[in-house]
């Protein structure tokens, strides 16, 4: 399979569609590092020690499974998550100075197949950058219904005064229940070693 750019910005690049179809290996010519799928690709391959492949979805390993065009999706996974706090101050690692009149927000949404993206809402939170921790105002439990958990994940975007300053991503296939650490990355996919997001995950 080859994917050619629609224009100069390669806007038709979507690795999830390849993975969902069972394509295991792809050569990627990434010309920018500030795209959601670039970070998603990096985090996904990290689970395989950067060997450069993603296993086929589980449904392709079932010989008796027949998928028709209008069948309902299989392997439904219900996930709930509550963000506890962000360890250490996020903004100080971006080199930006905070003013009291400005604010931070974090959005959380599903990055995956079209069915998963369309059936789940995007959550938005206001962040309060404290002396030690970045706290979350009006924290609430987020719930997601996932059809293709093998090739999907959660994307976190942190904005300061409406400017994107940090991102995070966690694939559903490596998500475990309990308190978990989610690494935070810059816009260029460089990991901030001294800060992270702490979340409480549960699978229903």
PLM region descriptions:
Residues 8-14, 63-70, 89-95, 125-129, ...:
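Eukaryotic intrinsically disordered and solvent-exposed regulatory patches
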Residues 39, 46-65:
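Long, highly charged low-complexity segments enriched in Glu/Asp and Lys/Arg with interspersed Ser/Thr
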Residues 1-40, 45-48:
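Catalytic and substrate-binding clefts that recognize carbohydrates or anionic sugar/phosphate headgroups
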Residues 59-112, 143-149, 203:
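C2/C2-like lipid-binding beta-sandwich modules
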Residues 133-147, 169-170:
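Exposed aromatic-hydrophobic patches
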Residues 37-44, 147-204:
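C2-type phospholipid-binding modules
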Residues 118-133, 170:
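Solvent-exposed serine/threonine-rich low-complexity stretches and specific carbohydrate-binding patches
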